[in-house]
Amino acid sequence: MTENRRIKRVNALLQEAIAKVILKDVKHPKISNLWITVTRVSLSKDLHSARVYVSVMPHENTKEEALEALKVSAGFIAHRASKNVVLKYFPELHFYLDDIFSPQDYIENLLWQIQEKEKS
């Protein structure tokens, strides 16, 4: 029970630290104009790897590119986040798209397309 509580607490700390690094420190051109939200972090029981689930806005066709950019930047993100979350071994980060906002994404994408059509 205590271990489970510890993992939940570390998940929350990692989520906050990773989100701050992505927002402030990552300067990758494919994600600089996107709104990336870290929706959850799932740490392995041995604390050596973490699944980081992200949601990417504003539109559908940038999600895969943003995910690839995050995967390329994973080492940098882990290094920067490790300064805020002190662990004996900082976990290896693995990024995944989270479909938690998929209905909202669909509506957002439709609104984006309407806006683009009105501009042209």
Curated annotation (Swiss-Prot):
Summarize the subunit comment: Monomer. Binds 30S ribosomal subunits, but not 50S ribosomal subunits or 70S ribosomes.
Name the chain's protein. Answer: Ribosome-binding factor A
Give a short account of what the protein does.
Answer: One of several proteins that assist in the late maturation steps of the functional core of the 30S ribosomal subunit. Associates with free 30S ribosomal subunits (but not with 30S subunits that are part of 70S ribosomes or polysomes). Required for efficient processing of 16S rRNA. May interact with the 5'-terminal helix region of 16S rRNA.
Identify the HAMAP family for this entry: RbfA (MF_00003)
Alphabetized GO MF terms: ribosomal small subunit binding
Can the keyword Cytoplasm be found in this entry's annotation?
Answer: yes
Gene Ontology CC annotations of this record: cytosol
Q: Which Pfam families match?
A: RBFA
Gene from which the chain derives: rbfA
Task: Note the InterPro entries from the entry.
Answer: KH_dom-like_a/b, RbfA, RbfA_dom_sf, Ribosome-bd_factorA_CS
Gene Ontology biological process? maturation of SSU-rRNA
Q: Does the keyword Cytoplasm apply?
A: yes
